[in-house]
Amino acid sequence: MKKAFCVIIIFVMIISSSAFSLADSDTSNRLSDLKTWMMQNHYLFPQEMDTAIAGIDTAGEARKLVVIDDHMNEVLSVHLNDFVGSDYEFDGLAGCIEDTAGGWFVLFSLNELSEEPMTGLYHLAPDGSCLWSSVFSQQVEWGWTLLAADGTGGAYLVHARTDHYKEALIRHFSPEGKTTWKKTLSFDGLVFSPFIGRSAGSNMTLYGTAVSNSKRIFQTVQIEFNTQGEIVATEARDFGKVSSDYASKIIWNRGTQMPYLLYMTSSQHTKPLSELPLCAFPSLNLTDTDASVH
């Protein structure tokens, strides 16, 4: 109880001392400031969300998952040991999103105490209790991950390939936490980088880039999946190659609720995807994945 009281006092001091102004900044700046504050105050692996930051609080005797909104309100605080269990060792926070049906989806990197690295997806109720969990082995070549809720208590999980950057693994979890399907996604002869997974009702819209320097193909791709693993809509836009600019990734603008392409030059600038010219959608491969592929 004493440690929890100390954390509350720290929050009050930070707010009253005006270390940064929450009222005078837009949401993006507030979240950036909040993320900086969390990193300075014993919070590891801070993850940006639409209206909140999730992080691991290491100040107490036991690590806690904490979600704080952009007005410094703590909306979730739960000890990792309450749901990770004793069979695994916590390694890192890989993702955290609010479930559109209520609660939270949290993705952790785990170390099985005697075996290979694992990934754990946990569905938490609004009070932090664990509704279901799915822990599976994580092969090294499947790197960063994206999460999207399906609005029914289930979720989509996207793994990006990091050894050749040409493939993504997509899986869907039912409201009971069962894997309903797994599919690999790739484009013929193109490097595919998925950047954003957004909930669209019960569907997920995946945003990424499909690029080939040799073929002079530089496209953003937008793919909408339903809960049965079917593609229901696609769109491609051409961002070309503009002088010394190059597109590094697609980001989500919280203010406009739209996807933007981030360009890198001597300074950063962005352009809404909607302002890029439409083009033919590239040849896509979507393959059911054998259950032995994790």
Question: What are these model-predicted stretches?
Answer:
Residues 8-16:
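Bacterial N-terminal signal peptides
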Residues 49-53, 102-106, 153-157, 202-207, ...:
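Entry beta-strands of beta-propeller and related beta-repeat scaffolds
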Residues 69-71, 125-128, 173-178, 225-229, ...:
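Short loop/turn segments that connect beta-strands within beta-propeller blades
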Residues 25-39, 64, 71-86, 131-136, ...:
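Aromatic (tryptophan-biased) beta-strands that constitute blades/sheets of beta-rich domains
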Residues 36-46, 87-98, 140-149, 189-199, ...:
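Repeated scaffold domains used in trafficking and secretory/extracellular systems
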Residues 62-66, 118-122, 167-171, 219-223, ...:
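A short loop-to-beta-strand structural motif that recurs across blades of beta-propeller domains
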Residues 15-27:
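Sec-dependent signal peptide cleavage junction
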Residues 58-61, 110-115, 161-165, 211-216, ...:
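Short glycine/acidic-enriched loop and turn motifs that connect beta-strands
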